[in-house]
Amino acid sequence: MTMTPLQLGDKIKRFFQPSLPPVGVEIARDFVAAVRLNPKDPTRVERSAITPLPSGLVNPSLSQPNISSPEDLTTVVKSILAKTEIKTGRISLAVPDSSVKVAIHQLDKLPGNENEKQQLLRWRLKKTTPFNVEDAHLSYVSQPGPDGKLNVLTVIIFREVLEQYERLFQGLGIQAGFITSASVAALELLPRTEAGSIPKSTLIVRSSPFSLTAMIIHLGTIVFFRHLDYFEEAQVDGAVPRVLESSGGEIRNLYEEIHPCLMYYQDKLGTAGVDRIWILAPQDLQPEELELLSRQSGAAVSNLNPLQSFRSYPPGSLPVLKSLLAPSLGLAMGSF
């Protein structure tokens, strides 16, 4: 049976732990964010906060240690947990997209035995992963794909990287019961955003000054995932990040980055193009910018508002910082 985006939300929850408290924490390259929802009403945000990080404290990498000073980062995390009055012993955690490898595999079928499934998926990841896949934690979700095949979404993280984040919270007496990439966490908000009008295909673009992640959902199945990290490139040559240039180049460069995604989708599935594009950026695009992207892509383009899923939230900076808080909001929402 083909899944709708609403069913996709239920499927993605296999990545989440429903028994976890409605608390989401994200550790990014340049900030730590935390969100706590009302445990009885997932549409109420009770507390949220973002704390900037000094440069170099968190260095996202697939194969190298991510945290340069666990003691300093622990101090920041402890402070933000106090601000948001998070007192639970278990949380959900989002880590940088650049610290986790997400891939999609088209398979005729998966073995019935869990050990055989793990072996098959690790074997497929072996040639494209810059670390020993046997020294990594692998999660996956199987989705119906085109032509009766399976689309298997895998999320793999090097164990040394994973344990750095786990130890950070263990030192505070907290278990990170579920850990995933920031963009996968934010994806939890999509089914609720599209609840009123479900398109056949959707492109979600999550951008920051130094990175871009693009995901395409076709008939409820994740068929495309692409992450680009420009931080190291900018560090080497001093270049302005390509995704968000100044002097009016922002939208042109954003389209240049998502154009290959659209072409891949059309070529792979033989379709005319995506129906809708959601943009999740630190600042909402202006109406004229959305219109330009719509003309370039041939799709309806809108800012994705993470707060659309919530009926109430504390006054203050949350509406301004909503896009930065999207992964934490998605994690907390995914606990229900």
Please report, for each region that a protein language model flagged, where it lies by residue:
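Hydrophobic/aromatic-enriched cytosolic interaction surfaces used to assemble or bind macromolecules
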Residues: 1-336
